[in-house]
Amino acid sequence: TYSGINFKDALAATGKGKILRSSVLNGGIDFSGIVAGSDSARFSEGDEVLVCGCGLSETRDGGYAEFARVPVNCIVPLPDGLSLHDAMALGTAGFTAALAMIRLEENHQSPPHGPVVVTGATGGVGSIAIDMLAGKGFEVVAFTGKQDQHDYLRQLGASDFIDRASVEMGSKPLEQAQWGGAVDNVGGDTLAWLTRTVKPMGNIAAIGLAAGFKLETTVMPFILRGVSLLGVNSVVMPLEMRDRAWQRLGADLKP
């Protein structure tokens, strides 16, 4: 079996985040492996499968173990195009980025609408999102404080960069519209700034809160520009959407 090391795993291991809901749990919020036994007709011994979220390392033991037992509605068949290793190389970060892409597509985000800015660009979700967006023909702007990582981000597909420290975020209900859309891993003031600077009918996929969970904005971007704020939750997700995202990770969204 394989399992990744994710941001939430680090928070759980260091005790810096309220991740573990029980005092003794195996870590690992995702894993891939081979079915050793099943009470469900959906899976048989020997099937290759994967699991992301579903309370792993929060309310039940996670993937840092030789064996794991999980509800059948959390399990996704390994898609064609991915090995067990590939699946966890992408892991929760890839799954989350794929969900963000699907949400943007469903709300009619398209390359002609303008550049898409990705915050937290050098992180797992940000890096994979840049690759996916560029692969679909979007102009991608990387928002980062790590100037020494520009070459890396350019290789992924970013065509321009925003230095986090140099941004004047302003305080008006609406600022100059610059972005066709956004994938935000940061939250806080950065997400509020994005709501004020995304173009009319643009979308923001909100994924993370590395800079804080409070969002201080107004209704103006939503009612005057038609901006849509799209939440992305990789933990609680219908099985159909889980399977759909992983199928695409093995096909057109594969890095």
Locations of regions flagged by a protein language model:
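Mid-domain Rossmann-like dinucleotide-binding core that forms the NAD(H)/NADP(H) cofactor-binding site
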Residues: M88-R164
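Glycine-rich beta-strand-centered segment in the early N-terminal region that forms part
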Residues: T1-I5, T14-L56
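N-terminal Rossmann-like NAD(P) cofactor-binding module of classical short-chain dehydrogenase/reductase
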Residues: L50, G180-V183, A205
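Short amphipathic alpha-helix with an adjacent loop that forms part of the alpha/beta core around
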Residues: V167-Q178
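Glycine-rich phosphate-binding loop and adjacent beta-alpha segment
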Residues: D189-K254
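NAD(P)H dinucleotide-binding glycine-rich loop of Rossmann-like/cofactor-binding domains
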Residues: V51-V117, P255
